[in-house]
């Protein structure tokens, strides 16, 4: 059996430059949760289907459970924690989810919010049908 291999990953997470050694087989979900305690990134299906682990990487939403941590080298990563204001206040999109009772059980809500953030920040216009097809 071979020994684990590690690689230094340098990236920006929620606006802060970070460096960490990661197992080359580790997912970005594992790195964010285990190394940085970013618990908004949930482990759900671990096959890229449920969206509970969604994060924004260089402006695009990805399932972090199927994105290797080593691929994050040089990237700008945002999790739900990046949306909080300086005094912990919720962002407009987070407040809208609360106001519209769009939280369900809450487990996948952070990932759904990050998908919504990508849609809003992309500047693209989508029909309700297009958004509905992309929703879980």
For each of these PLM feature ranges, what is it?
Residues 1-135:
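Signature of N-terminal electron-transfer/Fe-S-associated modules in redox systems
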């Amino acid at each position: 059996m071979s020994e684990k291999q590690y690689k230094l990953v340098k990236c920006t997470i929620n606006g802060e430059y970070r460096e960490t050694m990661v197992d080359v087989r580790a997912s970005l979900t594992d790195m964010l949760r285990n190394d940085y305690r970013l618990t908004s990134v949930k482990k759900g299906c671990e096959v890229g289907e449920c969206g509970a682990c969604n994060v924004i990487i260089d402006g695009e939403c990805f399932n972090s459970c199927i994105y290797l941590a080593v691929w994050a080298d040089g990237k700008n990563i945002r999790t739900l924690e990046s949306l909080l204001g300086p005094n912990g206040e919720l962002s407009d999109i987070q407040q809208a989810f609360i106001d519209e009772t769009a939280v369900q059980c809450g487990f996948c809500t952070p990932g759904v919010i990050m998908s919504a953030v990508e849609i809003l920040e992309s500047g693209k216009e989508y029909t309700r049908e297009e958004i509905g097809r992309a929703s879980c």
